[in-house]
Amino acid sequence: MNLQVNHISTYSLIIEPNTKIYIDKVKNIDEDLDYEMYKLINKKLKKEKLIHYELSNYSKKGYESKHNLNYWNNNEYYGFGLGASGFVDKERYENTRNLNKYTNGIYIKEKYLVSDKEMLENEFILGLRKIKGINKKNFQKKYGDINNIKILKELINKKKLIENKNYIYINPKYLYIQNSILINFIDS
């Protein structure tokens, strides 16, 4: 913390099959230890006046990653260059990773139109990564009344989500196991 940084991203290392680190027999750490490290990181960064603004991100006031917040707000973005991805006019695309194709003007590897259902799922899955959660007025403008979503009401009643005047967000005690909440919004 002697570096006086303005922004820190933290992630648990997950060892994936068929990677060099997996092949070298490195094992994932115990979940309890991972959780203890998560709590320690939160405590230390809070002490350093870094704001926990997204599941894996902390910053000093005014130094939040605008680039990443654009993703978490489910907004459009362009991707330029090999392997880049973008999201424009409800269409997701991925550029080719092949340099020869790219230099010959064949930029897009694949693209698909995002359905209304998937847009709504993404709004919850991405928006609830933010500690502030989903802005209810912004949601209303995009999709209509947020109060009509059954799974949302169920999660609020179970105290996994919290609703205030302006936002719906994950109860802080469930942030570490956030994925177990977010999965409820897929195919709901």
PLM region spans:
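Minor-groove-contacting beta-hairpin "wing" of winged helix-turn-helix DNA-binding domains
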Residues: 167-171
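An alpha-helix initiation/capping motif
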Residues: 35, 145-146, 172-175
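Non-catalytic, well-ordered alpha-helical scaffold segments
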Residues: 118-125, 149, 175, 179
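Short amphipathic alpha-helical interaction segments
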Residues: 143-157
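Short, amphipathic alpha-helical interaction segments positioned at domain boundaries
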Residues: 173-188
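C-terminal scaffold of the Radical SAM
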Residues: 1-143
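A short, conserved structural fragment
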Residues: 156-166
